[in-house]
Amino acid sequence: MSLEERMRKAERTLLAVLLDPAKLDDEGARKLARAASEGGADLIFVGGSIGAGFRINEIILSVKKESNIPIILFPGNVDGVSPYADAILFMSLLNSTNPYWIIQAQALAAIPIRRMGLEAIPTAYLIVEPGQRSAAGWVGSVNPIPRDKPEIALAYATAAEMLGMRWIYLEAGSGAEAPVPSEMVRLVRERTNLGIIVGGGLRSPELVRERAEAGANVIVVGTHIEEGRDALASVREMKEALKS
């Protein structure tokens, strides 16, 4: 069974810890990998928007020394690909105003990804307000989805599904002051069959729980774990929120 199939068949919302290679050295990567493993995380995402391709292979190998959790690439560009990962979110930034982020980067990366034998998970990537002020939003030249217009997110999600994509990543941006609204998650869940990944601005167990209850298949936490005083405790509290 593929990793994607296991993700879709999971009976509960999965917790993914995001590691940004641009912000970590080997020891930092190992520390967060231990926290993810001991805290009960289900997945580790590796990637970022600026400079994340630098030493990505070394970071992933460091993570693998501390954890058996599946590693999924969350690429910010064509340099965010590694043969040492278990899968890659093969993403199209649908609400970018720059065609490079919609299809050109994907075309450049597709053949190397296939040659590496990486499992590709076709994913629509949508950046929601206030994500335009995040690194991903700035680099990706986005026209952000308004927070109070969940029907716009649904329109993109429906188009993604009709194009054959199987997942959608609703992103508010790393460290966002406000996460993706639960109502937006709920509407996409009710009106499509896409797997839903939600990330950005999820700083508390309550925010995580609300998005899980709205229908998210995967919750992604990164900045809260990286910048917190106790990474293990942070992972555990997020995991407990998904159990309740």
Swiss-Prot record:
It is found in: Cytoplasm. Its cofactor is Mg(2+). Mg(2+) binds at residues 20, 49. Keywords: Cytoplasm, Lipid biosynthesis, Lipid metabolism, Magnesium, Metal-binding, Phospholipid biosynthesis, Phospholipid metabolism, Transferase. It comes from the Archaea. Pathway: Membrane lipid metabolism; glycerophospholipid metabolism. One of its GO terms (biological process) is glycerophospholipid biosynthetic process. It is an enzyme of class 2 (transferase). Sn-glycerol 1-phosphate binds at residues 169-175, 200-201, 222-223. It catalyses: sn-glycerol 1-phosphate + (2E,6E,10E)-geranylgeranyl diphosphate = sn-3-O-(geranylgeranyl)glycerol 1-phosphate + diphosphate. The keyword Metal-binding applies. GO terms for molecular function: imidazoleglycerol-phosphate synthase activity; magnesium ion binding; phosphoglycerol geranylgeranyltransferase activity. It holds the Pfam family PcrB. GO terms for cellular component: cytoplasm. The keyword Endoplasmic reticulum does not apply. Its EC number is 2.5.1.41. SUPFAM superfamilies: FMN-linked oxidoreductases. Belongs to the GGGP/HepGP synthase family. Group II subfamily. Prenyltransferase that catalyzes the transfer of the geranylgeranyl moiety of geranylgeranyl diphosphate (GGPP) to the C3 hydroxyl of sn-glycerol-1-phosphate (G1P). This reaction is the first ether-bond-formation step in the biosynthesis of archaeal membrane lipids. This is Geranylgeranylglyceryl phosphate synthase. The lineage of its organism: Archaea, Thermoproteota, Candidatus Korarchaeia, Candidatus Korarchaeales, Candidatus Korarchaeaceae.
